[in-house]
Amino acid sequence: MNMKKFFAILLICAMVLSLAACGTQNSSADSTGQTLAATRTVTDRAGREVEIPIEVNTIVCLGSGAPRIAAYLQVVDKMIGAEDCDTGDVTVLRDYSWVYHDELKDLPSCGKGGGSGQNNAYPEQIIQLQPDVILAGFSAESADELQLQTGIPVVSVYYSSINFVDESFYEATRIFAEVVGAEERCEELLNFIDECKAELDERTADYAEGDKPTCYTGAVTFSGRHGFCGTYANFGPLMAVRARNVADEIKDVNYFETDFEQVLVWDPDIIFLDPGNMNLVSEEYVSNPEYFHSLRAVQEGRVYTMPSFNNASTNITYCLMNGYWAGMVLYPDAFGDMTMEDVADKVLSFMLGKNYYEDMVAGGLYYGTIDIGG
């Protein structure tokens, strides 16, 4: 350990001990003999039992997904610090950050931010802020580390990006709501998501497997940006509408890099691509235009956008919207009464209180066709 890091840890420990000592002195000086504030225990997503105050009025939200849940639960007003990724320049790639930027941009910095699940918080600043609770999209080890660094309860609300709004998000949101007293809004939110999922399922339930077009989603974003061969098996928005995703034949995986020859063997009826990564696909096209023109979906003009919904964990809003979009493309008869403008208004207005679909389109998150090489 270098000396700079050693002295930084000493400083943090000294601050924590100083605050604890002040609390002890104040308690001892209390002639009425009143006990310290009552607490309660919550079990977080990592299975840790965390003792927190009965009433939680101020919070800091860190890491993968935690600030987003605060926005969905409409408790951003309890946040007294924000991460660097939400206070600087923001884009529509992160739903909550775009909507709540005015509220977050002037809050004190309390961490770097991002979706790593690791502890990249700024403990000294958090100690100065003294929130009642820290809610973090951290692993158990990272949550323990930050709690030791600050002396403040850390509740893990990490959720995964696998499949289509899976149970981990429900659990994380309910734990978050329990901490901040937002149980009513929480159940409204989760019921809304359930209704969307049920609608997608019901509209596609009567299609025989052989009557469905095959499809492939490429140029996806996972651990960075990828070109045409970056894909997903068990891709949430496609699963939600019972799609025939050709990549699903690769078992027990989620995102992976296939190869050009395999996609040609699959030769899907419909191709979805992330518009945010089309510069990579365009470079591949320039290198081998004949390959792309040999694909039936390209020949027939059946290549569509599928905007990325992962940025510092999953944008649940965009994930739901992508499910509706997949349904519209794959089953036009079943979704002919819908437009993406209507879907965006429904999802964004309920979950974030603002329909900013025009901003999404302007920022590159649009729903439509793609002309590869055009």
Regions found by a protein language model. Give the residues of each.
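Alpha-helical, coiled-coil/dimerization segments enriched in small aliphatic residues
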Residues: 227-254
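Proline-aspartate-enriched helix->loop->beta-strand connector
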Residues: 115-118, 122-136, 260-276
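Structural recognition of the beta-strand scaffold that forms the well-ordered cores
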Residues: 58-63, 78-83, 133-137, 154-158, ...
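Extracytoplasmic substrate-binding proteins
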Residues: 49, 143-223, 247-248, 305-372
